[in-house]
Structure formats: C-alpha cells, structure tokens
A protein has these predicted regions:
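Outer-membrane beta-barrel "beta-signal"
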Residues: 263-283
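C-terminal structured "cap/appendage" subdomains that terminate the fold
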Residues: 228-251
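A glycine-biased, small/acidic residue-tolerant capping/turn segment at secondary-structure junctions
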Residues: 151-154, 250-260
Length: 283
C-alpha cells in the first residue's frame, strides 16, 4: 500500500507491505530463502525539487522485516533492518557541468542471521559536457564490508537496488553472491559519451574494483572492467541497443567470487526495445 502527497516542490510517500506464503493454511511464516523477500516493510520517502533551485534532495527511511525459521517445527523469528539516508543532485550554474550526484545511506538493526549491523554506502558522480557531442564523467562508489572482526556486521546490503545499472555491466557484484565472504566494494569509474547524431549515441566506461574491507592474505584490488554500449533510436517507439564488456580480474577475485581470473571473461549483447503507445486518453 502506498500513500502519497505532492504539492509544489514537495513529494512525500508512505509505503506499507506485508508478505505471507500463500501455500500455508496456518501461521504467518515467510522464510528467507536466499532471494530477497521480506515479511514486512515500512518506507517513508521525501523528495524536494524546486524549479528555481539547483538542488534536488531525496530522503529515505526503510524498516525491513526479514523472517527466518524452521519449516518443520513452524517456529520463526522476524529480524528488523533499518536503512536511511539521502540522495542529492546539484546543477552548477556556470560552465558545461552536468548535474552532480551524491548519496549516503546507513544501515543498522539486525540482519537475517541475527547479527547487529553497522554499515554504510556513499557515492558521488560528476560529468562535464565538452561540446554538444562529447562528455566525460567521473564517479566513485563505496559500500562498506565486513572483515569478520568485532561484534558488528559491517557489510552494506544494497537490497532492492537496480544492480545491473551499477558496478559494471557484467554483474559481478551484488547481482550475484559473494564466495562465503562480505568484503564490500569500491568502484572507481571513468566514462566517455559521444553522440554521433540525434538518433545514435555511444558510451565507454572503465571500472576499477576493489574490496572495502581487508581480508586475510587477500589484496584489495579485484580487477578492471570495460563496458561499451551503442544506442540507436531507429524510429519512433523503436530503440536498438548493443554492448560489449570485458573483465580482467586478479587473484583476489578468485577468492571472493570463485572461478579463474586467468580465463578470458567477456560478454556481448543486443536488444531491441519496442514501446508503442497503444491507447492514450486525456480527461
């Protein structure tokens, strides 16, 4: 359920959610099984965006209930994890700077393993338009990790983020599981965008990955990834996209993700997006 309020530059959303396994005739269990379901969730989101201001600001608070238990004995317990923080964009008034983006989020409470959590993530990205065709961007993401020491679990969980949009197009991180560790992630990015015409654009992005936490006998550097993407607006409502990515990992990548970093790792793809407007009614 979502309740919303909007007036002028202000938006406020309040979201409530509750899940129960439909196949159970009794009880209220919704056991965590490796995907990322939740038993219940409460979220408060506020956004401020004034046309006269160069700032857009979002504030988020989420309380997430994750249920674990024993299906045979039908005993369960719900642990609550809180995530809160802000996302800000700023448009410089002078020059060819594109909007600067920054975010910070903190997690506390308990995870599904009943561990006390103290974790955070931070990110910043800036872009500059050289001319009407060329632009460059620079960014950095930091998601805290856990080294196994202390009484707090320090690895930030991005939960329901659009993982394919971040941390490289090959989805090495967070879209797939770690190899029995939770080292966090550092992602330093450098990108170049080129518009050949109004219909065609290309982008090339470089990522350098490293762990956030220091693990025993493992260096932080994980490797580098290069992502290329071509977008072509063929006609109204039809878009063709294609891309190619390569990853060059290190020995540390073998430890945290498995596999063999010496093997060639690449990925190519082509997609056609057809998005026609079938029916439009204006009251």
């Amino acid at each position: 359920m979502k309740l919303g309020y909007a007036k002028n530059a202000h938006q406020l959303h309040f979201i409530l959610a509750f899940n129960q396994n439909k196949e159970k005739s009794k009880g209220g269990t919704y056991y965590y099984d490796g995907a990322q379901p939740y038993k219940n969730m409460q979220t408060l989101w506020y956004h401020y965006a004034a046309q006269a201001s160069n700032f857009d600001v979002s504030l988020l608070f989420m309380n997430l209930g994750l249920e674990t238990g024993d299906a045979e004995t039908e005993t369960s317990r719900t642990r609550y994890l809180q995530t809160f923080g802000t996302y800000v964009t700023y448009q410089p008034e002078s020059g060819n700077w594109l909007p600067v983006q920054a975010a910070f989020y903190y997690q506390t409470g308990k995870n599904k393993n009943a561990q006390s959590v103290s974790a955070f993530m931070a990110s910043v990205k800036a872009a500059y338009a050289i001319d009407k065709q060329w632009s460059v961007s620079l960014g950095y993401d930091y998601l805290s990790g856990s080294d196994g020491e202390g009484d707090k679990f320090k690895a930030f969980d991005p939960l329901y983020g659009t993982h394919h949009k971040f941390y490289g197009a090959m989805d090495y991180f967070y879209a797939s599981a770690w190899q029995g560790v939770a080292p966090g992630l550092q992602d330093a990015q450098l990108g170049v965008n080129f518009k050949t015409s109004k219909q065609v654009s290309m982008q090339l992005n470089y990522h350098y990955f490293a762990t956030a936490a220091k693990l025993d006998d493992v260096k932080k550097g994980l490797g580098s990834e290069m992502d290329y993407q071509l977008d072509w607006n063929v006609m109204k409502d039809v878009k063709l996209s294609a891309g190619y990515s390569i990853m060059r990992g290190t020995k540390s990548m073998d430890v945290v993700k498995g596999g063999d970093h010496k093997r060639w790792q690449d990925w190519g793809w082509v997609s056609v997006n057809i998005n026609p407007r079938i029916l439009f009614v204006k009251w």
